Amino acid sequence: MTLTRIFYCGLLLVILSGCVVQSSQLSALTGLFKSPPVDLSANSWSVRYADYEAIVYAVTVPEGTLFSNKAGDQILFDGWSIRQVKGMGRRGLGYHNTDNSNQRTFMRGNRKIAIHSCMAWQQQEQSSMKRFSQQCGDREPYVNSILVAKDGSIALIHQVVDDRYTAMTLTKLN
């Protein structure tokens, strides 16, 4: 009986040894699913909002350009205006705005928090760059601006994004 038991245990060990996944096999298998690291430095921007500063990365989405980072900051820019702001070092911060004719409506959630009058965008040449500016205001006047480089890429966005007239500045780093 012990001889039979030894035989079956030996047979079981031989069968199981064929099922061992070696580390090189596992590494090759996991290597198939890993994507190579992506260098985002070409799409990096600095964002400043009140006393908060961070680095964000630009990604093209159907609605425009989304600037975001691992901290949860999100800024949606439609090509002319910053439309949504989330995060910015503040838990629960979330603004969005819409334009209708010459009015910009600022919202927090579903609640309307301010309506500002905004003029049409004006273009000016400024040392080999184009500066687009927009006069806006309600109780106080302010200017939104976009600076465009010679190659047509946006270099700087400066816009008021909330009812407290807090400006956000996005600056291209590379």
Label each region the model flagged.
Residues V20-L76, S81-N174:
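Acidic, serine/threonine-rich low-complexity disordered tracts
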Residues I15-G18:
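C-terminal motif of bacterial Sec signal peptides marking the signal peptidase cleavage site
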Residues M1-Y8:
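Bacterial N-terminal signal peptides that target proteins for export
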